[in-house]
């Protein structure tokens, strides 16, 4: 088995590669009749324009040009890949118009990491193996979406740590920075026979430092206020793709845009009271009625977010500053944003972190009957700690996400 991860993060059209013993050798596998049949079946399967899915290695075409950079950097890549395929390994795959764009392989380990300096003792860890994100468009943030998948997997498996190894090259600085932003620290090194050395970046999943991003995705309840924030259906799914309702047409609604893929979200609204939000406040996202049925069953709580910052029009020097701040992570287009800046002087801009999707959506009827909620205004209202906890319970949130 390959002991080193292959991590590629193609940022803004550049090719940033992490892999041991870089070589320019290309090793495409020779197609066999069985492979050809499998590929034909795979290619004939209907896949929507934007598709994030879990696939077996054996169901992915190893001859896909997507893997050429990995073959070029790691001569044994095909051998490693075939071993994973034979073992039934799976990976997160992201397709755009039927073309493989992103690939994430994660692995659970429990042994001592004896090949590192210093040696890391045996613990249950999630290893980030292959991480390749092809960001050809400067405005996409699919790397953040994979980061959320890494965190969610770590929570689901109840690991002690997450780790990834990478070479500390200038080209990889942005990738290192992204991991560090989410609480990974350089605590060890991995030496190679050719004299090269990789950073070992580790995130401790058992310790929080009361920092919004370092502690991500954990939700710290103590010392924070809790609210319900309503969002209309046409905006909700674009902002929170993991919180999609079964009745919504996922692939018709979700596009490859930064607000869909990012951990950060920006929402602009005119609801009374929201400008009083502060950093660290917790938000239960409430998808309002789509008018395809009674609000009692169609309006639902779907997600938990944490407020990063709140701004009003007076916080922006000019229109361009407003558009620059909001355009990347909001669901609104530039023309729409500019129009609002010119015509509205009382909107509120909420920047938040997307922590958790509810496992079970909590409908309006249950909110009333089980939580005792019946505010005069459903757009935005405050929760007691007891009500917040009850919504998390009804939403079947994994308790590992919650820090008291």
Residue ranges, per PLM feature:
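Long, low-complexity intrinsically disordered regions enriched in small/polar
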Residues: 2-40
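Contiguous surface segments at macromolecular interaction interfaces
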Residues: 36-46, 153, 159-160, 164, ...
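Short amphipathic alpha-helix that is part of the acyltransferase structural core
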Residues: 43-87, 93, 235-257
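Short hydrophobic/aromatic beta-strand element in the GNAT-like acyltransferase core
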Residues: 89-94, 103, 130, 349
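Conserved acyl-donor/pantetheine-binding loop and adjacent beta-alpha core of acyl/acetyltransferases
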Residues: 97-130
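Conserved acetyl-CoA-binding loop-helix of GNAT-fold acetyltransferases
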Residues: 133, 139-155
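Short coil-to-beta transition motif at edge beta-strands of beta-rich domains
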Residues: 273-292
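Short coil-to-beta-strand transition motifs
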Residues: 294-306
């Amino acid at each position: 088995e390959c002991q080193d991860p292959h991590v590629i993060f193609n940022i803004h059209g550049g090719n940033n590669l992490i892999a041991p013993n870089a070589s320019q050798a290309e090793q495409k596998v020779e197609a066999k009749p069985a492979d050809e049949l499998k590929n034909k079946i795979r290619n004939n399967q209907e896949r929507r324009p934007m598709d994030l899915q879990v696939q077996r290695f054996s169901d992915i075409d190893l001859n896909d040009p997507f893997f050429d950079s990995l073959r070029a950097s790691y001569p044994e890549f095909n051998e490693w890949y075939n071993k994973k395929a034979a073992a039934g390994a799976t990976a997160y795959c992201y397709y755009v118009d039927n073309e493989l764009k992103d690939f994430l392989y994660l692995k659970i380990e429990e042994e001592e990491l004896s090949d590192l300096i210093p040696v890391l003792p045996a613990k249950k860890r999630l290893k980030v193996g292959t991480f390749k994100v092809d960001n050809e468009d400067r405005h996409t943030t699919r790397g953040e979406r994979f980061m959320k998948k890494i965190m969610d997997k770590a929570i689901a498996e109840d690991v002690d740590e997450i780790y990834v190894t990478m070479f500390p090259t200038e080209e990889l600085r942005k990738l290192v920075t992204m991991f560090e932003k989410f609480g990974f620290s350089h605590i060890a090194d991995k030496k190679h026979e050719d004299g090269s050395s990789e950073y070992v970046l580790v995130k401790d999943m058992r310790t929080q430092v009361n920092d919004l991003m370092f502690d991500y995705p954990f939700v710290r309840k103590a010392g924070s206020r809790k609210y319900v924030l309503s969002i209309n259906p046409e905006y909700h799914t674009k902002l929170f793709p993991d919180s999609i309702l079964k009745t919504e047409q996922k692939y018709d609604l979700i596009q490859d845009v930064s607000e869909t893929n990012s951990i950060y979200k920006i929402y602009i609204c005119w609801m009374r009271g929201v400008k009083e939000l502060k950093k660290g406040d917790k938000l239960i996202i409430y998808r309002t009625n789509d008018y395809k049925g009674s609000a009692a069953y169609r309006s639902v709580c779907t997600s938990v977010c944490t407020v990063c910052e709140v701004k009003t029009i007076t916080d922006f020097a000019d229109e361009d500053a407003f558009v620059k701040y909001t355009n990347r992570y909001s669901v609104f287009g530039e023309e729409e944003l500019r129009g609002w800046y010119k015509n509205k002087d009382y909107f509120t801009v909420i920047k938040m972190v997307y922590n958790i999707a509810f496992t079970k959506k909590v409908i309006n009827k249950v909110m009333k009957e089980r939580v005792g909620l019946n505010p005069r205004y459903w757009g935005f209202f405050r929760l007691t700690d007891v009500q917040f906890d009850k919504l998390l319970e009804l939403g079947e949130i994994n308790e590992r996400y919650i820090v008291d």
